[in-house]
Amino acid sequence: MSTPETKTIAIIGAGPVGLAAAAHALERGLKPIVLESGPEAGHAVRQWAHVRMFSPWEYNIDKASERLLLAAGWNSPEPNVYPTGADLVANYIEPLAARTVLKDHIKTKAEVIAISRVGFDKVKTKGRETAPFEIHYRNGKGPETLRADAVIDSSGTWLASNPAGSNGLVAIGEAEQASRIAYAMPDVLGRDRARYAGETVADGLLVRR
């Protein structure tokens, strides 16, 4: 009797959600491949390293990920402490990505540019739901292709902020003033202090003159 082929799961993003998905996939006998566009796991979280989270450690540690970490000799943080983004990276994301079996399943500097079903296009739909996925991504060496049985998008929204206008549209004049608008959470007390000192906050946006 032939052995069933191991299913491959492509996971976009190596943040806490993507790594948790990979940990659960491994526990279920699946083969996860994590594609992270940044140079290291937790790339987006590192951009808000200065922000303290609104929930303590006990609610931010995935159980499957925790099992992998404990098997690698990890010391869990105090459950009632509220971590910053930097804490989350240093005490959870980095050890999970570098010290557990997940390290062999993560591709960094891998920017996904397109996903489709193998053998299908916009005018062919019958049987589409059973066809494997084809993922195109870029890395430092050029374009690459990956086949997977399923895709999990855990890329998040940090690098894809909403526009300032209503109805999901770019506001009039927004594109022209893009260099003056901060769409995320700048570190106004640290890294970005010089840029924003003495500037004005308007309509929830930090704007430079």
Language model regions located:
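Feature captures the FAD/FMN-dependent oxidoreductase FAD-binding
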Residues: 75-160
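N-terminal Rossmann-like FAD-binding beta1-loop-alpha1 element of flavoenzymes
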Residues: 7-34, 209
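Conserved acidic residues
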Residues: 8, 149, 203
